[in-house]
Amino acid sequence: MSEWIEIGKIVAPQGLKGDLRVYPSSDFPERFTEPGKRWLLSPGQVEPISIELLSGRYVPGKGLYVIELAGIKSRQQAEALRNSQLLIEKGDRPQLEADEFYVPDLIGLTVINQLNGKTIGKVINIIFAGNDLLEVEKISTDTPVISEVVENNLPSKSKRSRDTKNQKKNQSPPSKKILIPFVKEIVPIVNFEQSIIEITPPDGLIDL
């Protein structure tokens, strides 16, 4: 899937004539309003299929688009596409301005506190709000036996204790998540070459 970029997800039918509600993961309205070829990946599919976008409109207050796809004429057909992804080819991405980023490129970057050089965690999601927020999973300082997880290539939650009486004691603590405003004052550096984001957090932000 590295050659594809998700631009939205079909969340529900709209009406009775095959229209679809799409929650966007792209900031470019033309992805949903300008007719042309798109790609569709339904749950369970390995490869996307080509589809034709006929029209689309933004729904104020809902944060989503209603689109019409060629060949989808009934609510039943639309329902069958629920949870499908709308995609574009990676090469179709427009050139961005300075300090603009594509969401998929930010996921997985390591977040570092510029003030002390310590690693905070990894970006796991972007939350779209008045100011966009980086959702960061903090690195736990209490995670036991990290080398064991790496050697077995299994996440810690998949490892089971043979001693059922000690199972709860040996479990890793749940990961903590924090939200970091994605603004220049707090996130001055995004370095894709090193796969890091440097932040200058205000007091208390990373302790929440």
UniProtKB/Swiss-Prot annotation:
Q: Which family does it belong to?
A: Belongs to the RimM family.
Name the domain of life this protein comes from: Bacteria
- GO MF terms, alphabetically ordered: ribosome binding
- What biological function has been recorded for the protein in this entry? An accessory protein needed during the final step in the assembly of 30S ribosomal subunit, possibly for assembly of the head region. Essential for efficient processing of 16S rRNA. May be needed both before and after RbfA during the maturation of 16S rRNA. It has affinity for free ribosomal 30S subunits but not for 70S ribosomes.
- For whether the record's keyword set contains Chaperone, the answer is yes
A Gene Ontology biological process annotation? Answer: rRNA processing
Compartments in which it is found:
Cytoplasm
Question: What is the protein named?
Answer: Ribosome maturation factor RimM
> What quaternary structure, including any partners, is listed in this protein's UniProt entry?
Binds ribosomal protein uS19.
Q: Which UniProt keywords apply?
A: Chaperone, Cytoplasm, Ribosome biogenesis, rRNA processing
A cellular component annotation (GO) from this entry: ribosome
What positions does the domain PRC barrel occupy?
98-205
Where are the annotated coiled coils located? Answer: none
Q: Which residue ranges are recorded for the region named Disordered?
A: 154-174
Gene name of the encoded protein: rimM
**HAMAP family (UniProt xref):** Ribosome_mat_RimM
The record's listing under PANTHER family reads: RIBOSOME MATURATION FACTOR RIMM
Swiss-Prot/TrEMBL domain comment? The PRC barrel domain binds ribosomal protein uS19.
